[in-house]
Amino acid sequence: MEKRKLEVLAPAGSFESLKAAVSAGADAVYMGGSKFGARAYAQNPEGEILLDAIDYAHLYGVKLYLTVNTLLKDQELEQELYEYLKPCYEHGLDAVLVQDLGVLCAIRKWFPALPVHASTQMTICGPGSVELLKEMGVERAVLSRELSLKEIADIYQKTGMELETFVHGALCYCYSGQCLFSSILGGRSGNRGRCAQPCRLAYQAVDAQKKALTGEQTLLSPKDICALDLIPQIAEAGVYSLKIEGRMKRPEYTAGVVRIYRKYVDQYLQNGAKGYQVAEADRKELLLLFNRDGFSRGYYEQHNGRNMMALENAKASDQEKRAYEALIEKLHAEYVETERKVPVRGQFRAVPEEPMQLTLSCRVDGQICQVEVTGEVPQQAQNRPMEEAQFLKQMKKLGGTPFTWEQLDLCLEGTLFVPVGALNNLRRTGLEALQKALVERYWREQPKAKEPEEAVSLKKAAPGTQKLHVSVETKEQLQAVLDFTEERTGQLHALYLEAETFEAELQELVPELQKKASETGNWKVYVLLPAVFRLHTKKRYEEKLQMWKSLPADGYVIRNPEEYVFLKDAGCEKEILLDHNVYTFNKRSRQKWTKRGVLWQTNPLELNARELREISYEYSIQVVYGRYPMMVTAGCVHKTLNQCKKKPEQWFLRDRYRKEFPVKNYCLDCYNMIYNSQPLYLLDRKVEVETLGAGACRMMFTTEKGKEPRELLERWITGTPWNGEFTRGHFKRGVE
């Protein structure tokens, strides 16, 4: 296979880390500014310092990508984002990473010349969502870390999109963009750049009978990924950018990791896959810089497994600590204290009766940049003329500049004398002009002034008109809902059947439910599609495509864009509803889906009542009861404990406060869903909920058994308080 150019993409959580990455050989860096980035606690530069960072990177031909990879509320998007990005755009920012669909649409409108990269926070798992993003103007997709080499190759072959994947650093246990763990437990949302990493804490695995299966272990803490050995395979799968994680790490870490990946990328680009081999010394150096119980190769070659988890994480020995300190000292001296230099070619010309002339040129990022400056007219020497060595001595002084001489030619005529100050001034002026030219070639003209957004009036549902939607994940819950419809005719508007639970019997079940609905209030039947929709899931659905096409359901509830594309490609003309994790944090993202014919959209779970009131309208669905899905994971707790039976069941994770989080394993697609220890309960706030203006309210049944669903449905009717443990979620507090 033809070798393509590869990009070594480095993290920079500070200006110092940026310099370290550049010195160590990064092709590009990604960093956050003072707002809207997924690492709010890094030492992110702001204002003029951020602009200096862009210029610094460009001086060396290194690209800088700015992270705006969080979900934005309406006020932030409409009143802050344009002014935040405008100076960066003018300074030649190379790209912006985004998570929010509304942000994507706004940037494409305001800054059409600014490339947009889709963040891994978008949970991009297949070619459908990549094509969708390409239609919206995205130039690069950062794929979910969980994808295999086969899946990556499939995406590249079908889309041709520029792809970026993680090759080194920390792995989240949850699919990026789908985690609410930190948000719900402490109000620090990963979707807002403030994750507190509860996944790194210890938990006990508890079975369905509440028997502890383990002591306290870090069951949700993956080892860091090190895919150094897989660079040829990753490149040949179609990946262009090799991303290193670590914006919270020190500059020496950045330098050390970038240096090694630079070495092996260059080796591969020069020699190909044949003979590609990683030296053990380099592998050990990476381990020394940082590891959690060793490394794994991530998900490139396996779906999940115990060997990917950091269950032990033993403390470093004294010898390892000394070796680490020595390595950090060495890296600091070589890459942090010592900045990279740009090789310069120069020609100095001094002849009688003409101004001195200095021409400087350098090649950066494959382009030649050249400047020419003039100085004073040389004097005729009265006594001893200046020798060539004296001119060279002054012109070669480059201390305090980012340049080093590659070549300097002198053209001298006659017997000349030039004051040292004049030579120094000429040299200084020339180097400043070259530096300015190198930086300003990236600068852009001012964008067009931001035009006021056309006001879109969305009709709100009147209090008391809210429809009841209910989702079920077990047959027992389904029966309880059916019993409710018989006794409370006309109360239910829509029933969602979880696809994986009922997949084998949908063909028979849906017609039965439609008949039941016609007898008890004409409610609708929707199929709730899987939380993730990857290549193996898609193939299974394609094998049953005729069944999905002919299924007499009223529509589908999608939990990711991949499912939307699958349904549309299959010719589906039925209703499509958005679940809460296809985020519509702002009106722009909501309108984007509406224009695609997706009217009913579930409100995000991280907005408070005031914010919900601003975005809710007659086609909004407000969740009023249910356990929040805290994590959707490719990892499986059963497999981690070597207890995989390929049989769905419910376990629990018990934390240090003895709270128990239900864990469901979905075996058809091999993923886990971890739920909150307490359900959201807003049934006694019915009057307040109705003032939001949403057209429907949804009750999510997940772990409820026996009479619980039936009793809870009655509480929706009566609006009565509940004596059990519950949470108000973010209804009052929201997220920062």
Tell where the protein language model's regions lie, with residue ranges.
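Surface-exposed amphipathic alpha-helical tracts and adjacent flexible/coil segments at the periphery
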Residues: 1-24, 28-39, 54, 60-68, ...
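A cross-family signal for key residues in well-ordered alpha-helices
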Residues: 105
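Conserved non-cysteine loop/helix-boundary elements of the Radical SAM core domain that shape
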Residues: 43-44
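Conserved phosphate-binding/catalytic loop of the ribokinase/pfkB sugar-kinase fold
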Residues: 122-126
